[in-house]
């Protein structure tokens, strides 16, 4: 028997060639092995024969209720326990030799993972970023073709590592969405260097149904074995609800800028859109960093506002303080935020910021954080169609609260009517200073025309995205490109 046969515990037909593995029947190619696994709505075994018809060499599944009479389809009861060893052997990659840094949270996942990625590269390590922005190996260009999901599943992750010729003992900074945690996409990875919950507010209730289910999904990240488990202090109040957190030998490390006695306390001493200074006091570090207990570290960076410093603290704590000096100001001015994350557009005559904020808390936090730096905020944003309707009125309320004028526009209306989306958003809101313009490009142009000299145009919701979904069609659209056209 071959190594692959031994791992699965089955005999392949003579001459069987396996070139790649997938759990998606849509990705099956000639030479694939298809893994039929439990899905959100149905079991993948349902697509076993479809996979063979598309060229799969064979199919394996763990559905005890499926009775399929085909010599190329195998039932393996403990299939999920064998997946990682199989993929290691197939791609000649030992995934356990890589260092994983996982970040989840309602807001900030992309920024924290990307900042961690940049820090590792700066200190001479190879690093791979995986998340909403796509994938980036070291400082190469972003590749957005591997997955449409924020977090890949284990098959997609191996495909990414294989295609990037990623060496063992590398570093992988990965965003982990609540959907991925609920679906246990990465539960097969045996060990994470660090796992972090940046914050928990209400989001994705179209999927999770209620805030308790959403929070349960977020805390699943601590079921992944890791020696550094970080959490913001506001979210840590829920930790007693989870026995697996209480019984873990590696305790949660809390991070706060409000409580001086938090495990990790940070304070911003100076902040502006161009330069910020802060310090970190290590009161009670993670188990593996006891040598830095009671130490204090000073930093400078080009990030703002406060929540981006908060995200950076998680990145620093994830890789460890041994990379930094205790008695100097550690200069982190080389760090940049991802495209479309609190992105100040440079070299144009007006103040323009593009950000990805697309839920009530993110909009409120973002606008309230930057309004001290600009006298008038003109905000362009919309609400997604076919998504949680309950947050629409809250999103508009947050935008109205901190702005002098709001331009409500389209943001992936999908199959819904734009007018209905606006009606939901306007409910119980004073819309005296709200202008409704369906065409997003026209909305941005209008906002630029009414922008006061000392004001700031803030474009929210799409960030780095370059598509717009309307009436089941996806078209190219970029907030950045519109700004370039206006100010070129």
Residue ranges and their predicted role:
Residues 1-89, 223, 267-270, 300, ...:
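N-terminal leader/targeting and accessory segments in enzymes
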Residues 1-14, 27-33, 43-46, 56, ...:
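ATP-dependent carboxylate-amine ligase
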Residues 4-6, 208-215, 219, 233, ...:
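Adenine nucleotide phosphate-binding catalytic loops in nucleotide-utilizing enzymes
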Residues 32, 51, 86, 103, ...:
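Residue-level signal for inorganic ion chemistry
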Residues 59-67, 131-134, 233-237, 257-259, ...:
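Short, polar loop motifs at secondary-structure junctions
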Residues 68-78, 144-146, 246-258, 263-267, ...:
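Active-site regions of enzymes building and remodeling cell-envelope glycoconjugates
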Residues 88-137, 142:
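Walker A (P-loop) phosphate-binding motif
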Residues 141, 146-242, 360-363:
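Flexible active-site lid/hinge loop adjacent to a nucleotide/diphosphate
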């Amino acid at each position: 028997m071959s190594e692959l046969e031994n791992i699965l515990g089955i005999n392949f037909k003579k001459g069987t060639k396996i070139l790649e593995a997938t759990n998606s029947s849509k990705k099956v190619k000639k030479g694939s092995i298809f893994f039929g696994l439990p899905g959100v709505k149905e079991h993948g075994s349902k697509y076993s024969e479809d996979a063979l018809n598309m060229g799969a060499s064979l199919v394996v599944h763990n559905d005890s209720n499926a009775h399929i009479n085909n010599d190329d389809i195998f039932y393996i009861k403990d299939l999920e326990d064998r997946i990682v060893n199989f993929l290691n052997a197939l791609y000649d990659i030992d995934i356990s030799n890589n260092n994983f840094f996982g970040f989840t949270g309602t807001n900030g996942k992309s920024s924290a993972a990307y900042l961690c990625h940049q820090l590792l590269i700066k200190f001479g390590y190879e690093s791979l970023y995986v998340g909403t922005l796509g994938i980036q190996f070291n400082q190469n260009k972003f590749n957005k073709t591997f997955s449409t999901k924020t977090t890949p599943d284990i098959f997609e992750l191996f495909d990414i590592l294989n295609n990037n010729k990623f060496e063992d003992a590398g570093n992988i900074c990965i965003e982990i969405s609540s959907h991925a945690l609920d679906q246990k996409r990465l539960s097969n990875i045996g060990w994470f260097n660090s796992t972090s919950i940046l914050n928990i507010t209400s989001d994705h209730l179209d999927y999770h149904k209620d805030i308790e289910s959403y929070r349960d999904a977020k805390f699943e990240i601590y079921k992944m074995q890791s020696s550094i488990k970080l959490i913001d202090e506001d979210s840590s109040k829920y930790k007693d609800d989870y026995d697996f957190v209480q019984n873990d030998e590696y305790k949660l490390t809390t991070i706060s800028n409000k409580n001086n006695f938090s495990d990790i306390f940070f304070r911003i001493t100076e902040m502006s859109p161009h330069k910020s200074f802060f310090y970190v006091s290590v009161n009670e570090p993670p188990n593996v960093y006891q040598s830095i207990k009671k130490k204090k570290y000073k930093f400078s960076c080009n990030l703002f506002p406060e929540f981006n410093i908060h995200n950076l603290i998680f990145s620093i704590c994830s890789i460890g303080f041994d990379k930094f000096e205790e008695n100097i100001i550690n200069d982190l001015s080389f760090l940049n935020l991802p495209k479309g994350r609190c992105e100040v557009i440079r070299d144009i005559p007006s103040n323009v910021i593009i950000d990805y904020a697309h839920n009530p808390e993110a909009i409120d936090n973002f606008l309230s954080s930057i309004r001290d730096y600009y006298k008038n905020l003109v905000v362009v944003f919309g609400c997604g169609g076919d998504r949680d309707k309950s947050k629409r009125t809250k999103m508009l309320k947050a935008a109205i609260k901190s702005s002098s004028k709001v331009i409500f526009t389209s943001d992936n209306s999908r199959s819904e009517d734009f007018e209905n989306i606006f009606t939901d958003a306007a409910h119980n809101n004073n819309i005296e200073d709200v202008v409704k313009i369906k065409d997003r490009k026209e909305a941005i142009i209008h906002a630029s025309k009414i922008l006061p000299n000392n004001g700031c145009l803030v474009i929210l919701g799409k960030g780095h995205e370059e598509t717009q979904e309307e009436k089941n069609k996806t078209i190219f659209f970029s907030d950045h490109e519109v700004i370039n056209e206006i100010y070129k």
